[in-house]
Amino acid sequence: MKHCLVVDDSRVIRKVSRHIVEGFGFEVSEAENGLDALDRCRERMPDLILLDWNMPIMSGIEFIVALREMDGGRGPKVVFCTTEHDVAHVREGIAAGADEYVMKPFDHETLQFKLTRIGLA
């Protein structure tokens, strides 16, 4: 079974994201900040990471840079899920190593479209 790590400081967003991704057949784990997410990736590298941009302790950008430097860290597909919508943020996220970008709030259909584009749906 494919594994997804949902990284967001909002418990509500993590739960909604979990529900959507489980509907796609993923096993899901959660982290509330980038540092916790790196620890989870060391334990088990996921196939997919849904990543918030603005988080305490370690931002999404800081996380993805650290992830891509880890052993096996180039493997997971990363989708930024954020309220940051200007073109500069999108470019920064993709340049840092994200595979796709989705605006919050998102629904089942939007996420499915994005996952299809990166080969995971």
Report the location of each language-model feature.
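Two-component/phosphorelay signaling modules centered on CheY-like receiver
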Residues: 11-29, 118
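Conserved Asp/Asn-Gly motif in the active-site loop of CheY-like receiver
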Residues: 31-35, 90, 108
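Acidic catalytic/metal-coordinating carboxylates
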Residues: 33-36, 59-65
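Active-site beta3 strand of CheY-like receiver
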Residues: 44-50
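Two-component signal transduction core modules
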Residues: 49, 101-102
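The feature encodes the CheY-like receiver
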Residues: 56-57, 86, 105
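Alpha4 helix (beta4-alpha4-beta5 surface) of REC/receiver domains from two-component response regulators
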Residues: 62, 85-100, 110-113, 117
